[in-house]
């Protein structure tokens, strides 16, 4: 069974209030996905999905994304073992963003750097210049061991 999404309505109230899921992909065929931990709500990552990735995620309850840099479908955690099991999928009011609540397997790390979250740095102002400060330097795994080329 292939999952096909209907074209979104041009009627704003239908997008906001109707029961049909009609995701609004951008001009590149992508939709933004925000990913949080299902247990503690921590923001883990932001990625993009094409229609195939979104359909696979809905059908399998395992997170799939579209890699813009590699130009292909990507099953999160396939290499590292940190698969994301989806417990809930939400969309925003105009259906142009997806929110996945996930449980991360393996090392409980989402970032390819080995950290739990891709959001491990704060942006701060020092001497009038924006700088990055690491707030989570704990590595759950060694990326050089997992992602050998």
From Swiss-Prot:
The keyword Transport does not apply. It catalyses: 1-(5-phospho-beta-D-ribosyl)-5'-AMP + H2O = 1-(5-phospho-beta-D-ribosyl)-5-[(5-phospho-beta-D-ribosylamino)methylideneamino]imidazole-4-carboxamide. Keywords: Amino-acid biosynthesis, Cytoplasm, Histidine biosynthesis, Hydrolase, Magnesium, Metal-binding, Zinc. Pathway: Amino-acid biosynthesis; L-histidine biosynthesis; L-histidine from 5-phospho-alpha-D-ribose 1-diphosphate: step 3/9. GO terms for biological process: L-histidine biosynthetic process. Mg(2+) binds at residues 92, 94, 96. Binds 1 Mg(2+) ion per subunit. Binds 1 zinc ion per subunit. GO terms for cellular component: cytoplasm. Zn(2+) binds at residues 93, 111, 118. GO terms for molecular function: magnesium ion binding; phosphoribosyl-AMP cyclohydrolase activity; zinc ion binding. Its cofactor is Mg(2+); Zn(2+). It is an enzyme of class 3 (hydrolase). Its EC number is 3.5.4.19. It is found in: Cytoplasm. Homodimer. Catalyzes the hydrolysis of the adenine ring of phosphoribosyl-AMP. NCBIfam families: PRK00051.1. Belongs to the PRA-CH family. This is Phosphoribosyl-AMP cyclohydrolase.
């Amino acid at each position: 069974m292939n999952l096909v999404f209907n074209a979104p309505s041009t009627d704003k109230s239908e997008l906001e209030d109707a029961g049909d899921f009609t995701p609004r992909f951008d001009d590149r065929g992508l939709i933004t996905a925000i990913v949080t931990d299902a247990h503690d709500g921590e923001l883990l990552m932001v990625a993009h999905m094409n229609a195939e990735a979104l359909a696979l995620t809905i059908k399998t309850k395992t997170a799939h994304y579209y890699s813009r840099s590699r130009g292909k479908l990507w099953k999160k955690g396939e290499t590292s073992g940190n698969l994301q099991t989806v417990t809930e999928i939400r969309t925003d009011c105009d259906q142009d963003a997806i929110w996945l609540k996930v449980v991360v397997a393996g090392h409980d790390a989402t970032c390819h750097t080995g950290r739990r979250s891709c959001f491990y740095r704060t942006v701060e102002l020092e001497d009038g210049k924006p700088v990055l400060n690491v707030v989570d330097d704990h590595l759950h795994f060694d990326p050089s061991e997992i992602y050998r080329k």
